[in-house]
A protein has these predicted regions:
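N-terminal glycine-rich phosphate/adenylate-binding segment common to multiple enzyme folds
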Residues: 73-166, 251-255
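Short, acidic/small-residue loops that bind anionic groups at enzyme active sites
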Residues: 112-126, 218-227, 269-283
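Short coil/turn connectors at secondary-structure junctions
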Residues: 31-35, 61, 86-88, 116-117, ...
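N-terminal beta-loop-helix "entrance" segment that forms/cooperates
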Residues: 60-82, 234-236
Length: 293
């Protein structure tokens, strides 16, 4: 992982940072502060990202934030926001609400497609001082983020009949499977579980499973198993400690990650992010629907 990060690290260190007021206090041997794109978002998003800003300031972290006001009711992500993320490589984002009904598409999905953020990673684990029903929970949910039911391919065939397409490709399935197994290998994880519904969606989820199985053969030191998504949810709430790394298609990963986060202490305190080779958008697992009282 260090070798892979070296070109990006050299690129960030070589950037000329314009002079500006920052909260960071230089220390001997430190380089220039790094810019991070900040999207406070909707609902409790500004509260969560604001807390992160306070932590960064208190620890004198070598970063400063380029803040943008983006909200879920906008028609599109502003180009300057995308340019900032491409430039800075790292973005801290609060939740963006997705309005119900037609007219406005999800800005979260737009971000994933524009930047090809194909992997969503959520780490759900017990936190000291936060009592939960289950102990020894340490689950990493890795979700394919660019296709499946979230492809946005919907249309009305005739009045009163809507067709929604689920797209699964071998390329994206293999890509997310490789990411999951590589993550497990690099982080000393012992098992990868593929979540599916191939007993019903035999072609779509069948292709996802076939891709996972092919990738699994290249990692003989990591145990691989499969579980149907409805049984997975039942097992999560009854015996979550049996899971390690979970790899899922898009929709299932959304449900599984939120369930696992709730078991481990709540969606507001579990770290997560969407990543590719060059960009990373870090967020908590909460929904923007959780509004402050």
């Amino acid at each position: 992982m260090a070798r892979r990060s070296l070109p990006l690290l050299k690129h960030l260190l070589s950037r000329r940072i314009p002079a500006r007021s920052v909260t960071y206090m230089h220390r001997p041997g430190d380089g220039s502060p790094r810019p991070v794109t900040l999207i406070p978002g909707d609902g409790i998003g500004p509260m969560v990202t604001g807390a992160v800003e306070q932590v960064m300031e208190a620890m004198h972290a070598p970063v400063y934030f380029e803040k943008f006001e983006v909200h879920g009711n906008m028609k599109a992500v502003p180009p300057e926001v995308l340019d900032s993320i491409r430039k800075n490589k790292v973005c801290l984002k609060g939740g963006l609400v997705t309005p119900m009904g037609g007219g406005v598409s999800s800005l979260n999905v737009q971000l994933r497609k524009e930047l090809d953020l194909y992997a969503s990673l959520v780490n759900c684990f017990n936190l000291p001082g936060l009592p939960t029903r289950h102990d020894n929970v340490d689950i990493v949910v890795i979700r394919e983020n660019t296709e499946g039911e979230y492809s946005g391919l919907e249309h009305e065939v005739v009045p009163g009949v809507v067709e929604s397409l689920k797209v699964i490709t071998k390329f994206c399935s293999e890509r997310i499977a490789k990411y999951a197994f590589e993550y497990a290998y690099l982080n000393n994880r012992k098992k990868v579980t593929a979540v599916h519904k191939a007993n019903i969606m035999k072609l779509a989820d069948g292709l996802f499973l076939e891709s996972c199985r092919e990738v699994a053969t290249k990692y003989p030191g990591i145990k691989y198993n499969e579980i149907i998504v409805d049984n997975c949810c039942m097992q999560l709430v009854s015996k979550p400690e049996q899971f390690d790394v979970m790899v899922t298609p898009n929709l299932y990963g959304n449900l599984v990650a939120n369930t696992a986060a709730g078991i481990a202490g709540g969606t507001g305190v579990m770290p997560g992010g969407t990543v590719v080779s060059y960009y990373c958008i870090v967020t908590s697992v909460f929904s923007s629907d959780y509004l402050p009282f």
